[in-house]
A protein has these predicted regions:
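Bacterial N-terminal signal peptides that target proteins for export
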Residues: 2-12
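Outer-membrane beta-barrel "beta-signal"
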Residues: 219-222, 427-428, 432-434, 448-460
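C-terminal outer-membrane beta-barrel translocator/porin domains of Gram-negative envelope proteins
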Residues: 46, 99, 122-166, 200-383, ...
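Transmembrane beta-strand segments that form the barrel wall of outer-membrane beta-barrel proteins
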Residues: 48-60, 71, 80-112, 124, ...
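Outer-membrane beta-barrel strand-turn architecture
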Residues: 76-79, 114-118, 169-173, 226-228, ...
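Outer-membrane beta-barrel initiation region
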Residues: 26-102, 108, 126, 136, ...
Length: 460
């Protein structure tokens, strides 16, 4: 009975996390979709129909389990303007959906958009959410399914309770400029009793204690996308740039290594930026070479709060190195700890980070695969095929602190670490179209064993 219940639970969570990926696994399918599920379903699609919405948060983690959103949504239009209102409550599956303040949240929003592809949009929202510290490393489905199946959570989390307003100018269907202002209370979240299919008796990695307090942030964001496809691109650019100006009062400081933060401050004001630059190039009808560069970190003002710090390592960045692995006595340029015992959970502590990724992709063909793809596999009206592509990749990256130059961890404001101090790896894999299997081996630290991992999405 327990095995049956576990299988059913695994099936539902798998669909809840994977459906956005399956929906883009191949070109548009001619079979009509289930319109009932668009309005009411655990993995509701982007329906424009008003009514009652029941949907998952498209993720799974050691703090919430599976967040379930339920409430009314309203969509209307007048000429070129479209209006949206949603009133969603959140119940989380941690501690078997226990009804308490940790398991309850909300997300209320109202917005207006003028123009379909080119136009502008105004949105306001009020929320009580669990948010990841570093969302840029790994997509939600990959992070969620790793936590659900193998009890590995590749993110850290904190609570965001407040409101924000966003103004967006859409230059095209996928390129935009936006400004955002928010007033929020940030708080630490604890690791909870959350189910996983395998290794369910193992202890979760602790969720790090972050800085609690009230913060105001102003963000300017640019998203420039010239790719020919947003899921499986073969040509074009994707440029994501963000500047954040934040200020706040810390009422309860989180835990950090002595070198990363000698003494916490109660009042702070900071400037922070993040640039994610990706280029996709087709070399031939069946081969591509793609590159990614990520630069982020402190720009000015006081030190960054722990919610806004950086790290590298693990399947989302440098998979040849284990995620948040602690090696006693070793200066860690992935999390920026000085070699002593790190705080519980080994949190991200770097004030700046740099990551470079390069991959070569070559599509594979065989008569067997052509036979298997004769009729697409269908799941809820979505057809997809197996499209194997061989992948070879290299990665290099590290984080560092800003301050008085010292050793290999602290650098001055205008300095950049030598490449010889970066963590590097190489790897091979096969991308089947709906998921990929890879193996990565550390180069800069030859004693590290090879890591085998799966990805739902392409690496970048």
């Amino acid at each position: 009975m327990m095995t049956t219940a576990r299988t059913i639970r695994a099936f539902w969570v798998l669909l809840a996390c994977m459906t956005p990926r399956l929906a883009h696994a191949q070109k548009t399918d001619t079979l009509g979709t289930d319109t009932t599920a668009e309005r009411l379903g655990l993995w509701a699609r982007s329906s424009r129909t008003s009514g009652l919405l029941l949907t998952s948060g498209k993720t799974y983690n050691r703090v919430e389990g599976l967040p379930v959103y339920i409430g009314p949504v309203f969509h209307d239009s007048s000429g070129k303007a479209a209006f949206n209102v949603s009133v969603l409550g959140i119940i989380r599956s941690a501690d078997t959906f226990h009804w308490d303040h940790e398991n309850l949240g909300h997300n209320l929003g109202a917005g207006m958009r003028v123009g379909r592809e080119r136009g502008y949009e105004l949105d306001i929202s009020s929320y009580d959410l669990v948010a990841p510290v570093e969302k840029w490393q790994l997509p939600d489905p990959d992070a969620g399914l790793a936590a659900f199946f193998v009890r590995r959570d590749f993110r850290d989390y904190f609570n965001r309770h407040g409101a924000k307003a966003i103004g967006t100018f859409h230059m095209s269907s996928r390129s935009s400029l936006a400004v955002e202002w928010s007033d929020e209370r940030w708080a630490a979240e604890r690791t909870r009793s959350v189910f996983s299919v395998f290794r369910n008796g193992k202890t979760w990695r602790a969720n790090p204690l972050v800085d609690a307090g009230r913060f105001h942030t102003a963000v300017a964001r640019a998203n420039i996308d010239t790719r020919n496809d947003d899921i499986n691109p073969s040509t074009g650019w994707l440029i994501l740039a963000e500047y954040e100006r934040g200020s706040g009062r810390v009422t309860d400081a989180g835990l950090a290594s002595p070198l990363a933060r000698p003494a916490p401050v109660s009042q702070l004001a900071y400037g922070r930026a993040l640039l994610d630059l990706r280029r996709y190039n087709r070399l031939s009808p069946n081969s591509w070479i793609n590159a990614r560069l990520v630069l982020g970190g402190w720009l000015h003002g006081d030190e960054l709060p722990l919610e806004r710090r950086f790290s590298v390592g693990g399947v989302g960045t440098i998979p040849g190195f284990d995620f948040r692995k602690y090696q006693p006595g070793t200066v860690d340029v992935s999390q920026c700890s000085d070699g002593g015992q790190p705080p519980p959970g080994n949190p991200a502590q770097c004030e700046r980070v740099a990551l470079a990724q390069l991959e070569y992709r070559s599509e594979l063909h065989s008569s067997l695969l052509d036979f298997l793809n004769w009729r697409p596999i269908r799941l809820r009206g979505i057809g997809f095929t197996v499209q194997p592509t061989a992948v070879a990749f290299v990665d290099a990256g590290r984080g560092w602190l800003v301050g008085q130059p010292s050793g290999t961890l602290e650098y001055s404001t205008h300095s950049f670490p030598r490449f010889g101090t970066f963590r590097t790896d190489v790897g091979l894999g096969i991308d089947l179209g709906i998921f990929g299997i890879y193996v990565a081996k550390a180069v800069s630290s030859s004693k590290e064993p090879a890591n085998v991992f799966l990805r739902l999405h392409r690496r970048f």
